[in-house]
Amino acid sequence: MNKNLSSSILFLFDNISNIDTVSQLNNKYNIFKSINTGAASNYESFINDIDLLKTAALKRSYLEDIKDNSTDFFNKHIDALLNSFIIKILPLEKDFFMLSSHSALLESGGNFKYDIKNDVLYTVYNNKTYYMVQAVLYDKYNPTHLLYLVQDLKRSLGSSVIISGGALFNADGHKQGINESIYMTILSILLSALILLTAFRKKSILYLMTTIIFSLTLGLAGCIFIFGTIHILSIIVSASLIGLVVDFSLHWLANNQNKVIKSSSIRLIVKYLIVNFIITAVGYMLFMFSFMLLLQQIAVISIITLFASLLYTIFFLPYILDGAYYTTSNIFNKIFHKYLKSIDFLMSYRLFVLLITAVIIIAGSIKLIATSTFSDNIKNYSSINKDFLKDTIIAGDITGMKNPSNYLVIDNYTIDKEHKLIIFLLKNNLINNYKGLSQVFLSVHEQAVLKDIFSKSKDNSSIINMYIETGLDKNFIEEEFNKALSFKIMDINEILNINTAAPFRYFYQNNHGVVFFESNKSYNDLMDNNTFKNILFLYDAEYYNLVEMINMYFSQIKSHAVILKLIGIFVGFFILSIVFSLKKSLKISFAVLLSLLFAISIFSILSIDINIFAVFGFILAGAVGIDYAVLMLNENINELDRYFGIFTSALTSIVSFVILTTSATYAVFTFGLSVALSLLIFLYILPLFAFYNKKAGITPPN
């Protein structure tokens, strides 16, 4: 069902002469596998199907008129026979009683009617006639070509054409994602290169860019190899890895400042680099337990990329930079020294700083508990093209097909069951309108009622005499009644096996029927309404709301993520306790947790949505925070170099994640902001615990 809806594009033209423009443009862009300007792709096939379905697809309102007064129906039929101006869908020898002229299929299940003369579906809205063209995209089409086709149509016809379809939003998101991934990657590389040049002064430091190229290439290739595809948001988020990729290199280079680099010096910190990788990889590996393919792809890209970076840093980079000599620029020194002085200041007032931190955490927690429902809203995750949205709303008004998110699923489905269910819901003002199979097709019972009316009318002499009085032969009339009685009563499976009815199959699958509906009542109002629940129970139906289901799904992932985060902290603590003492491990784990709570509280106080992407951002940040703690506790490196390594690597990582906050996609924005903010807090909170026994921070050398 979703595939059918997402691959279909609707075009509405206010001039019938323009309906062929879609086919003409498709010759240029080749994105549509079928384009229907009429009721069917094959007119003769459509007419034959109308014949087969002339009773099963008879409009219910017309059936009710026949039931209410069959004599009046036959009187009107005689008038129609004598009126040469009335258009007959089928020849009289096939459909003497002209039931096909009242087929619900001629209205396409919405506001549209069928113009048999021009073989086109049309509707009138605000005193203007609109002609419909439906196009179905190839399974593998070029989204950019779809946007080009739409641009060409709008450029030539302007508001004379309305275009609607879910694929438009996907194509626009794809284009936006590609543009963002390109500029974010370029900007991240340029800023990282600028930081490295400022910190190490010599151009040879740009060899670190080879680490980025090598690692990211393997990461993206690995994702495509494992999943067979890659989400555009995965590519965007992978741009943020640029800062993390050079972390291993910067940790090593921090111990080689102001001296000639020897390739053998890497051995001093290999153990710590491996620990760093394991902890960060565990942070990303937790994403694999998410149900979201996007997060799983991010995990795979990140783990492979960081592993490649680790190997490159250990086995290649030391030999590339062997013999190099790096000193820090004056500009970077000034910035770095100001950072060290700020650490001195914070350590001098450590208890006061921790008190302020605790107050902010308490305030943020109170607001979070008071205002948050812990539920996610899918509407906050993406940006929507306003022009496409405007056309979609207009198209919904014109067609009467707004694709509401409310729907019912009926077990052991029959059309009769659906029809009775809808009648009860409408009578109780629980729904306003609906879309389902009972809108278009009659139930087995209703078809039998129609057959019974013809059977009784055949034996009704007054009705037969009405036809004889017009000059028709009695035997001919009786033969036509016998033809009408010979039609087959069709169940839902037989109906949907006919080509013209096949598109309605997405309303019925595996003995389950789907009914879409609109209601003035909210999701919660319907869920709390006993009458609504009793009616659904009576007819084996269940209520779903697509948006609420997605929100609930995301909320479940978020709660799952919180559990994963706690597991991650425990795993990080376990790894730390192997390398360091239990006391140090507890101290650092607490510092990381405190920093994350501080960052979350800032989100809460500033009313920034803590959605699932923010939660996973905090999970990742926690792993990176433990990495920094490992470097701080590495006594093989003097304290000043430890600070330098952490500050430089944090700076490149923060820049990479800050760039994500420029994304038009809210999910990417919150992910980038949550990590960047957490890393910034780590720079100031972690030293308070890593060097807890110092009375003050490190004094910069003169």
Segments predicted by a language model, with ranges:
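Membrane-embedded transmembrane helical bundles of large multi-pass transporters/channels
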Residues: 148, 155-376, 547-702
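Short, flexible, solvent-exposed loop/turn segments with mixed acidic/basic and small polar residues
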Residues: 1-4, 121-125, 369-373, 394-401, ...
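Active-site lining segments that contact anionic ligands and/or coordinate catalytic metals
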Residues: 403-405, 431, 501, 509-514, ...
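Extracytoplasmic
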Residues: 41-197, 202, 438-573
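Short beta-strand elements
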Residues: 30-44, 160-164, 432-438, 542
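Juxtamembrane extramembrane loops of integral membrane proteins
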Residues: 1-50, 384-385, 391-427
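Juxtamembrane segments of multi-pass membrane proteins
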Residues: 351-352, 357-469
